[in-house]
């Protein structure tokens, strides 16, 4: 570090605008301070008032979401992640976050540090991460740039997670032209903690010491938060220095040291250093605790020479945390972190001044009110909204605008859909991840509608899933978001769990675009509708706006991370694969289900007819609740041999996947006569689940449903050792061997990336 400060640039309006602040925001800063900010203060405001840190364009909308529940142990925004009581003295911390912009310019490091950051949020709560999931979106794999991004992101996730020692147990990958220049990389972490061992983030006690723990500080990631709050354009490649560099082995040491320090009772409060680094941690901890801090930046361990206060405050170097402890506990902290070869350097003190003050060799370089920077007094905007003009065209679509299928075309159509990268096997992805490390994984990727992990020592498990179909949200933002929540919960239900709470990652376009903001607002309404109906409160999450590229905005994509509890880990986990020859097949639907089958918004319409049109598929939330409740009851009673929800690709793909995932089994099923064959087989209306039961349990299934008047079980057929045979009305339409279905399903992704 230099002994004396270099002369910082003179702060003026032009410099503020270069930092991403608006004219109005700079005027607000001048008014609040009554003076021109220092260069370091300007940097602090620029990152903390960025959308990435402040949620200034989303807070008003997010406050409308359901956030209360009997099992929730932390309020939204109060801690680093959501915290849910799952019984037996255990709590689950879970959260999903985005790393979209960094991954667009540096896919490997961008994805890797996204994984590292979300895990830190979890173990900062005192919870040990037990599994990870991801939700990824890319453009067409026909483009070489997309293949480069896809490969880099998957390797980054795999290398970091595998080295860190936490299994990646599930996720989803979609490929749509709308994500061509702006991939989405959303990472979710789930951890477990004893309810009496949780750690807090608020710095509440003046006189406590402020300790920087973990890795040394460098120049990587400076203004990463600001970069994440701007659109991607042709010049974004120049922002590679804004992408952080992660080290999973250091993070593993940080995990063990931090959990040990929390167990030993020497951590008063703790905050991960993510976006905006020391700045965000210090200001957020002070704002939450109603206190202040004095920070001595010349004490910060650095790995590069000549770093200035501005750079130290804004660095986003990874694998660092800010710990507040009682006086006298810093020696114990230093011993614990030193044992793991990590820094534990006292850099400041909690104060009662209500100011965060930064010093360099006792010279004050910044003094700001944390409430103005990270608390309740940050700017909050409600932007103009306008219904998108494109909806006039998409809603004009009628299913009859495209020709129906002839029976002879069904097999080719089905294999085409099974070979679509959106539906096809993601084995190429999963095989790059360690899915079994730590031996908690009961059901891994692809084996069920959701992953299931063991809660050791309890007899329980967790069912976890990420979900969102951006095409649905594009066509109908409110209903599409409802479907995202409903399907995530339905997947957890089909895997044997009871959904209890959700986290969300809101990926949308430029909030200054009224059409993009309208979609965001409607999607938040939809998430709220479904969360309330399904009794799955929102525990927190992430907002990523400005997801635009030179060709336009992404599909609005509110990714849902759903948490469910499996009450009996030995009997309830349920596979998506057929289990036994002779089992009876049923389709669970709402009792009065008579909604016209349509192909609107379907993978069939997109893949076969190259159309993204119509409305989002039908969903009635009361019907959805009824079907999920019935499915949960049937699984608890031990009647269900396999369960798979009807979603992308419709009923035909659902049945085909059940065959593909089984060990040499097939099925014979008969569907009612339909006005349109394509809609009956490939329409994606919601609230449908295919289950199989032992032949002797068919009557028991009917009896069990008497307590669920809103649901009926339609007999489809039986499990066989032969092909997949489908009859619609009286007409056979499909006779395909398991091998013929499996080949395109397994080959699509490897063929596309090579």
Curated annotation (Swiss-Prot):
Residues annotated to bind substrate: 98-101, 120, 244, 316-318, 544
Catalytic activity: N(2)-formyl-N(1)-(5-phospho-beta-D-ribosyl)glycinamide + L-glutamine + ATP + H2O = 2-formamido-N(1)-(5-O-phospho-beta-D-ribosyl)acetamidine + L-glutamate + ADP + phosphate + H(+)
Quaternary structure note: Monomer. Part of the FGAM synthase complex composed of 1 PurL, 1 PurQ and 2 PurS subunits.
Top-level taxonomic group: Bacteria
Location in or out of the cell: Cytoplasm
Annotated Gene Ontology cellular component terms: cytoplasm
PANTHER family, sorted: PHOSPHORIBOSYLFORMYLGLYCINAMIDINE SYNTHASE SUBUNIT PURL
SUPFAM superfamilies (alphabetical): PurM C-terminal domain-like (SSF56042), PurM N-terminal domain-like (SSF55326)
Positions bound to Mg(2+) 2: 121, 272
Positions of the catalytic residues: 52, 99 (proton acceptor)
GO function term, MF aspect, one: magnesium ion binding
Residues in the signal sequence: none
Organism: Salinibacter ruber (strain DSM 13855 / M31)
Alphabetized NCBIfam families for the sequence: FGAM_synth_II, PRK01213.1
Coiled-coil positions: none
Keyword Amino-acid biosynthesis set for record: no
Binding residues annotated for ATP, in chain numbering: 55, 95, 504, 541
Protein name: Phosphoribosylformylglycinamidine synthase subunit PurL
Disulfide cross-links: none
Keyword annotations of the record: ATP-binding, Cytoplasm, Ligase, Magnesium, Metal-binding, Nucleotide-binding, Purine biosynthesis
Principal cellular location given in the protein's record: cytoplasm
E.C. code: 6.3.5.3
Top EC category: ligase
Role this protein plays: Part of the phosphoribosylformylglycinamidine synthase complex involved in the purines biosynthetic pathway. Catalyzes the ATP-dependent conversion of formylglycinamide ribonucleotide (FGAR) and glutamine to yield formylglycinamidine ribonucleotide (FGAM) and glutamate. The FGAM synthase complex is composed of three subunits. PurQ produces an ammonia molecule by converting glutamine to glutamate. PurL transfers the ammonia molecule to FGAR to form FGAM in an ATP-dependent manner.
Record pathway: Purine metabolism; IMP biosynthesis via de novo pathway; 5-amino-1-(5-phospho-D-ribosyl)imidazole from N(2)-formyl-N(1)-(5-phospho-D-ribosyl)glycinamide: step 1/2
């Amino acid at each position: 570090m230099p002994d004396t400060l270099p002369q910082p640039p003179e702060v003026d309006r032009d410099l503020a605008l270069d930092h991403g602040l608006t004219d109005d925001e700079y005027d607000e800063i001048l008014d609040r301070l009554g003076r021109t900010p220092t260069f370091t203060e300007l940097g602090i405001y620029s990152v903390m008032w960025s959308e990435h840190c402040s949620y200034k364009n989303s807070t008003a909308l997010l406050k409308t979401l359901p956030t209360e529940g009997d099992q929730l142990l932390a309020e939204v925004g109060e801690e680093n992640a959501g915290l849910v009581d799952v019984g037996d003295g255990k709590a689950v911390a879970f959260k999903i976050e985005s790393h979209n912009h960094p991954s667009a310019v540096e896919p490997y490091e961008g994805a890797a540090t996204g994984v590292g950051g979300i895990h830190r949020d979890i173990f900062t709560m005192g919870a040990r991460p037990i599994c990870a999931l991801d939700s990824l979106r890319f453009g067409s794999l026909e483009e070489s740039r997309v293949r480069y991004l896809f490969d880099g992101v998957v390797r980054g996730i795999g290398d970091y997670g595998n080295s860190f020692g936490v299994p990646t147990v599930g996720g989803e990958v979609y490929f749509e032209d709308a994500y061509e220049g702006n991939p989405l990389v959303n990472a979710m972490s789930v951890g477990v903690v004893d309810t009496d061992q949780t750690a807090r983030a608020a710095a509440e006690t003046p006189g406590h010491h402020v300790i920087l723990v973990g890795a040394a500080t460098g120049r990587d990631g400076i203004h990463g938060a600001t970069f994440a709050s701007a659109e991607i354009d042709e010049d974004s490649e120049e922002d590679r220095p804004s992408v952080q560099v992660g080290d999973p082995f250091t993070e593993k040491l940080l995990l063990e040291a931090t959990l040990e320090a929390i167990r030993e009772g020497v951590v008063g409060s703790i905050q991960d250093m993510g976006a905006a680094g020391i700045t965000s941690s210090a200001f957020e901890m002070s704002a939450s605790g109603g206190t202040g801090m004095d920070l001595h930046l010349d004490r910060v361990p650095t790995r590069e020479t000549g770093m200035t206060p501005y750079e130290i405050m804004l660095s986003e170097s990874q694998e660092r945390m800010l710990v507040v402890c009682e006086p006298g506990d810093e020696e114990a902290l230093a011993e614990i972190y030193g044992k793991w070869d990590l820094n534990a350097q006292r850099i400041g003190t909690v104060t009662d001044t209500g100011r965060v003050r930064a010093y360099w060799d006792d010279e004050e370089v910044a003094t700001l009110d944390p409430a103005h920077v990270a608390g309740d007094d940050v700017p909050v905007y409600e932007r103009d909204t306008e219904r998108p003009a494109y909806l006039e065209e998409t809603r004009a679509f009628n299913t009859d605008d495209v020709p129906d299928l002839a029976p002879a075309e069904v097999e080719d159509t089905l294999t085409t859909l099974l070979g679509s990268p959106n539906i096809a096997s993601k084995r190429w992805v999963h095989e790059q991840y360690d899915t079994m490390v730590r031996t908690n994984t009961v059901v891994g990727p692809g084996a069920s509608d959701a992953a299931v992990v063991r809660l050791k020592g309890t007899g329980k498990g967790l069912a976890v899933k990420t979900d969102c179909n951006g095409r649905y949200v594009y066509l109908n933002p409110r209903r599409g978001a409802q479907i995202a929540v409903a399907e995530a919960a339905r997947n957890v239900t089909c895997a044997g769990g009871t959904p209890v709470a959700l986290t969300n990652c809101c990926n949308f376009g430029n909030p200054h675009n009224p059409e993009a903001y309208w979609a965001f607002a409607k999607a938040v309404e939809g998430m709220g509708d479904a969360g309330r109906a399904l009794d799955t409160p929102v525990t927190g999450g992430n907002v990523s706006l400005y997801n635009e590229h030179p060709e336009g905005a992404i599909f609005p994509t509110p990714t849902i991370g759903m948490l469910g509890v499996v009450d009996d880990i030995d009997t309830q986990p349920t596979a998506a694969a057929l289990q036994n020859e002779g089992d009876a097949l049923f389709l669970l639907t709402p009792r009065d289900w008579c909604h016209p089958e349509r192909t609107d918004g379907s993978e069939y319409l997109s893949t076969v007819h190259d159309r993204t049109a119509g409305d989002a598929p039908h969903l009635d939330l009361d019907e959805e609740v009824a079907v999920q409740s019935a499915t949960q009851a049937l699984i608890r009673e031990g009647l269900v041999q396999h369960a798979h929800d009807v979603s992308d690709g419709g009923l035909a793909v659902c049945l085909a996947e059940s065959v593909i995932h089984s060990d040499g089994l097939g099925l014979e099923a008969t569907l009612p006569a339909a006005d349109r064959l394509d809609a009956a087989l490939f329409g994606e209306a919601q609230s449908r689940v295919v289950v199989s039961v032992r032949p002797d349990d068919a009557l028991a299934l009917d009896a069990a449903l008497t307590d669920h008047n809103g649901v009926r079980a339609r007999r489809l057929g039986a499990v066989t050792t032969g092909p997949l045979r489908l009859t619609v009305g009286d007409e056979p339409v499909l006779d395909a061997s398991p091998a013929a279905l499996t080949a395109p399903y397994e080959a699509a992704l490897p063929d596309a990336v090579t």
